[in-house]
């Protein structure tokens, strides 16, 4: 048995990874409850604010692969500390911004720190865990950004703003301090001799050119298949997550009711991410992937009937199940693909998220554009169901 499998300290490291991912979710969502006050203070239009909020995914697409290379060279300890530091710097820079351009670049900076944790987390888990425990570990760490986002939504206006005398800049400084403190905690945990020794086994020596690594990975059919599915999964998740409150509001709900109902998939997703990935052993992974994608497609279809509580509840539960586990199972499949492994997990993760975030950008834009053209979200929801059908055809080709 490998050293990482014997050591109970791997769970301590997993807690550190979870903390960094929590900082990711906290900072990513932090501006959403502050949009109104920031827009008023800086004199921004809704369009300008939308452009600012979309700055980091654009940078993410370009930076994911270089970040994956850096992670393979530097290792998870250094990379995840850098991630927390950049996330903290992004939050602090937002607090100092005094115009549209400054805020745009502050948010864009998050797109460099984000990939380091998104890619670094599965690489570290692939080092320290195997089999069902690896799937459980992935399910645990993916709850970090979800809970970080929930905390940002729940506490920014109810606690942080009153505590900071209503100053949104000071709130962002607070979140920057939390993120940096988390980075220091991670660095301390990852400096344990056992962690340092195991990490050294996964750091590439630079003998193989990274261009060759990229090409070798893309030659693997399972990798190409997973990348295509990742684009579809991010298209679905980002598209529906961004527009769900508005879909519910247009079905007749108040803004408060829509917010409550829209939180259901997040809560279900946390439970799903803890339970389902550990069941996705190699022999069952294809069947579970098909079931998750089918759940996503059915959820989009049921949301056509958001005015009726029964199909709405079923749709939101199914969305939460798919949202919590779909990407985790895909990432698990990728890192366990022959020819990838722990040594190239960073580079493979960089390719994965570079491809996936293309769907993440196109999803919200497409649903919004279709809504403008048709006057509603029905066509967009049908499109999501259709994409899920195509993903099922791809998932069937996954080999156990």
What are these regions (language model features)?
Residues 29, 57-65, 150, 266-274, ...:
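Residue-level signature of mid-helix packing/kink "hotspots" within the transmembrane helices
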Residues 62-98:
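Conserved MFS/SLC helix-loop-helix module at the cytosolic interface between two early adjacent transmembrane helices
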Residues 73-83, 281-293:
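Cytoplasmic membrane-interface "Motif A"-like loop-to-helix N-cap segments
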Residues 341-374:
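A late C-terminal transmembrane helix in Major Facilitator Superfamily
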Residues 31-32, 221-263, 269-273:
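Extracytoplasmic gate region of multi-pass secondary transporters
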Residues 284-333:
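C-terminal transmembrane helical hairpin of 12-TM major facilitator-type secondary transporters
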Residues 140-191:
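Helix-loop-helix hairpin linking two adjacent transmembrane segments in secondary transporters
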Residues 106-144:
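Cytoplasmic helix-loop-helix junction between adjacent transmembrane helices
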């Amino acid at each position: 048995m490998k050293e990482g499998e014997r050591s109970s300290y791997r769970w301590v490291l997993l807690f550190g990874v979870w903390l960094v991912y929590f900082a990711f979710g906290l900072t990513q969502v932090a501006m959403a409850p502050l949009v109104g006050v920031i827009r008023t203070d800086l004199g921004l239009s809704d369009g300008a604010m939308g452009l600012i909020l979309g700055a980091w995914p654009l940078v993410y697409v370009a930076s994911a692969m270089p970040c994956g290379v850096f992670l393979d060279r530097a290792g998870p300890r250094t990379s995840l500390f850098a991630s927390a530091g950049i996330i903290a710097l992004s939050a602090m820079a937002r607090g100092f911004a005094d115009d549209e351009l400054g805020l745009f670049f502050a948010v864009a900076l998050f797109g460099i720190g984000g990939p380091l944790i998104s890619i670094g987390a599965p690489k570290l888990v692939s080092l320290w865990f195997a089999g069902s425990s690896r799937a459980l570990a992935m399910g645990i760490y993916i709850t970090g950004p979800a809970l970080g986002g929930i905390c940002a939504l729940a506490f920014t206006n109810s606690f942080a703003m009153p505590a900071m005398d209503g100053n949104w800049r000071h709130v962002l400084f607070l979140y920057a301090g939390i993120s940096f403190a988390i980075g220091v905690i991670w660095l301390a945990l990852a400096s344990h001799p056992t962690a340092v020794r195991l990490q050294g086994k996964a750091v590439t020596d630079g003998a193989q050119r990274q261009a060759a690594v990229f090409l070798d990975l893309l030659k693997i059919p399972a990798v190409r298949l997973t990348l295509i599915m990742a684009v579809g999964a991010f298209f679905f998740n980002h598209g529906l997550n961004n527009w769900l409150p508005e879909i519910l509001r247009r079905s007749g709900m108040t803004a408060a009711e829509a917010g409550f109902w829209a939180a259901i998939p997040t809560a279900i997703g946390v439970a799903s991410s803890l339970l389902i990935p550990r069941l996705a052993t190699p022999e069952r992974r294809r069947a579970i992937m098909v079931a998750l994608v089918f759940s996503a497609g059915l959820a989009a279809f049921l949301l056509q009937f958001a005015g009726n509580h029964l199909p709405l509840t079923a749709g939101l539960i199914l969305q939460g199940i798919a949202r919590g586990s779909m990407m985790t199972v895909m990432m698990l499949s990728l890192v366990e693909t022959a020819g990838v492994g722990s040594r190239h997990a960073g580079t493979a993760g960089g390719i994965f998220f570079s491809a996936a975030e293309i769907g993440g950008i196109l999803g919200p834009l497409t649903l919004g554009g279709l809504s403008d053209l048709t006057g509603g979200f029905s066509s967009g929801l049908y499109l999501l169901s259709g994409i899920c059908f195509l993903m099922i055809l791809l998932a069937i080709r996954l080999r156990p």
